[in-house]
């Protein structure tokens, strides 16, 4: 019988990051700030917000499909904050379900990141899922900077913020 030590740990970690990610995303007035960029080389706020909402779905693709091709990866067309939140919640459910249904043997299998069919790199799924959770945290942090620059209050994430003293 295959163990679920890694899958359980990754699922618990993902579940820890989701509430604060949700609190950030639900504060974004996407319709108003979609095209905001703090610098000419920065991502637009709409793209960054969608990226944060989509990252959990990557976990499901890693487990179930064993590859992601960023050239052909389908991105949702999101125009409203309501659509964004529905998309995020759906992606979280898919990630959680995939982790619940996987076992540690599954996570030892190889994941491939591709660009237009060309393999960019491969590694065990457990490594890339862990990196993907880090990626979510990184871009959520980036999003909080965009929020601050637009006068949007920053929620408590790992502790109180200047705007939210709850913990």
Residue ranges and their predicted role:
Residues 6-7, 30, 79-81, 127-130:
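A short, structure-level motif marking secondary-structure boundaries and short turns
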Residues 6, 17, 21, 89-93:
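A general secondary-structure boundary signal
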Residues 61-103:
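Helix-adjacent hinge/juxtasegments
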Residues 1-15:
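Extreme N-terminal tail/first-helix region
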Residues 11-25, 33-74, 114-167:
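Short, contiguous alpha-helical
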Residues 26-29, 100-103, 147:
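A structural signal for long alpha-helical coiled-coils and helix-turn connectors
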């Amino acid at each position: 019988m295959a163990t679920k030590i890694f899958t359980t740990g990754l699922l618990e970690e993902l579940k820890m990051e989701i509430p604060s990610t949700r609190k950030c995303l639900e504060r974004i007035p996407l319709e108003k700030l979609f095209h905001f960029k703090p610098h000419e080389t920065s991502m637009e706020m709409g793209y960054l917000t969608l990226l944060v909402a989509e990252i959990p779905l990557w976990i499901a693709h890693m487990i179930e499909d064993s590859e992601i091709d960023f050239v052909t990866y389908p991105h949702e067309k999101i125009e409203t904050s309501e659509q964004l939140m529905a998309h995020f919640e759906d992606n979280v459910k898919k990630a959680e379900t995939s982790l619940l249904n996987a076992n540690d043997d599954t996570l030892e299998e190889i994941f491939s990141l591709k660009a237009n069919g060309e393999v960019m790199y491969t590694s065990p799924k457990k490594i890339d899922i862990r990196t993907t959770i880090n990626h979510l945290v990184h871009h959520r942090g980036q999003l909080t900077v965009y929020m601050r620059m637009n006068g949007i209050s920053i929620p408590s994430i790992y502790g109180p913020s200047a705007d939210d003293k709850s913990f």
